[in-house]
């Protein structure tokens, strides 16, 4: 909040802060403003666009790299530019993906649970593998995927990857394969870094998990929709893979980022995720560092000003 206020003062802009995301219940609060920026993690209803147009809004600046919460054509039809923050701190997410991997492989949660019970024995259940001896599969080699691969490269691992658009620079530290299935079959760790699209919805389903090594781990600091949660839980229960670290959940918008410490969670699937012994869940927090928060805010609000002053922005996605 202080960073945002400082930006507003520096740029002579008046800001109104709303705690919630944009919904049909609070859309009336936009009236009287020249620009709009939101950190959406639920779909913007199509009926919102004509209302925003009526309010004189010409853009929505999404404060994240992902923009799958918007109907881009519908927004464009009403003269509304959608922008994103294509790269704000890939290092933040990459470091978290590495951290999640280490927590899985080194069985941190199991060790913590034993320690809290004052059971300090060295047992086979907490004996770990060695990342250095593993093959890492990176799905998606955009900004975040490449940084993640570089960090893994520092462990001395073999890195295989899949992306529709291969990056020449990345070929110096990873090897591209012709399909996701080929990457999965070779990998001890599979880390996801592809944008959410209609084509990759539930791409990682039970059938895909059948191609995993039984000893392999899945790390998703990407988008929840890429993973079929029911399929993942079944695969874990059936021993198709050893564990998963999820920083996102396909129906998370009902819960994240909100405080449910004194509320009941009425999503049985989410409860299964939270309680599953082979899943490490974190609340979409991989990006949440001082650097990324500052960059997200500054880049998104700069996009608002660009549209207001020039009619367009370099971060436009529609």
Regions found by a protein language model. Give the residues of each.
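An N-terminal-biased, well-structured beta-alpha scaffold segment characteristic
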Residues: 1-82, 205
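Short, conserved active-site loop motifs that form the nucleotide-linked donor/cofactor pocket
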Residues: 13, 80, 174-175, 278-280
């Amino acid at each position: 909040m202080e960073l945002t206020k400082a930006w507003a003062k520096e740029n002579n802009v008046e800001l109104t802060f709303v705690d919630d995301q944009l919904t049909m219940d609070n859309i009336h609060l936009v009236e009287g403003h020249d620009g709009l920026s939101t950190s959406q993690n639920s779909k913007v209803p199509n009926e919102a666009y004509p209302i925003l147009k009526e309010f004189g809004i010409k853009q929505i600046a999404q404060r994240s790299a992902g923009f799958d919460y918007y109907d881009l054509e519908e927004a464009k039809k009403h003269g509304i530019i959608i922008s994103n923050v294509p790269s704000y701190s890939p290092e933040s997410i990459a470091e978290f993906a590495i951290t999640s991997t280490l927590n899985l492989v080194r069985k941190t949660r199991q060790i913590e649970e034993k320690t809290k019970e004052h059971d300090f024995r060295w047992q086979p259940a907490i004996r770990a593998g060695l990342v250095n001896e593993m093959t890492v599969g990176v799905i998606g080699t955009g900004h975040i995927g490449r940084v993640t691969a570089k960090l893994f490269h520092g462990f001395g691992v073999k890195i295989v990857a899949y992306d529709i658009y291969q990056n020449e620079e990345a070929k110096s530290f990873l090897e591209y394969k012709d399909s996701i299935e080929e990457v999965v079959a070779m990998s001890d760790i599979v880390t996801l870094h592809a944008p959410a699209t209609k084509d990759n919805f539930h791409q990682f389903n039970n059938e895909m998990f059948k191609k995993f090594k039984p000893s392999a781990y899945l790390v998703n600091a990407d988008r929840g929709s890429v993973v079929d949660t029911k399929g993942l839980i079944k695969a874990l229960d059936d021993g198709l893979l050893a564990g998963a670290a999820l920083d996102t959940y396909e129906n998370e918008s009902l819960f994240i980022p909100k405080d449910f410490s004194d509320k009941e969670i009425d999503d049985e699937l989410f409860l299964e995720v939270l309680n599953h012994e082979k899943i490490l869940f974190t609340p979409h927090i991989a990006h949440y560092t001082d650097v990324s928060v500052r960059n997200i805010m500054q880049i998104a609000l700069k996009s608002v000003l660009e549209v207001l002053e020039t009619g367009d922005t370099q971060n436009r996605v529609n």
